[in-house]
Amino acid sequence: MVAWYPVSTAANGPGFVPGSNCTPTGRFRVWKKIGRGARMGTIFRSREAVGHWRGETCEEDLILSRILWLDGLDAANGNTRERYIYIHGTNQEERIGHTASHGCVRMTNRDVIDLFRRLPEGAEVVIEATALGVILPPLML
């Protein structure tokens, strides 16, 4: 392991079923990177920049700063891309380290920008159910 980032994964725990709001585990590749050059705090909806979050408190689970859209490499997680499972920044950084998402992997905005910079499309990442973190293989950094 070369890098580890604290994250927030699904409040519903790990899983692979569409509509379950669970975070899939296993091996993935970064299928698509979205948000290159966007300001920290840029709000994305349907993978399009639609505004900027200014730090105000809100209950909505915003997708911020960068998106790394994942594609599953294992039989069990092969539907990940179609489930729109991302690694992304969040407006709820205080919940990092706790299960809180609707299936995506949330990171602090600084960390997701750093990860976005480090990983090319096609890079492999591992999500484990035993730790609230994302592991990156040595050759990708």
Across the structure, where does each feature detected by a protein language model lie?
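Local beta-strand/beta-hairpin segments that build beta-sheet-rich folds
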Residues: 1-2
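Electropositive
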Residues: 5-33, 38
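Exported/periplasmic cell-wall-interacting domains
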Residues: 19, 38-141
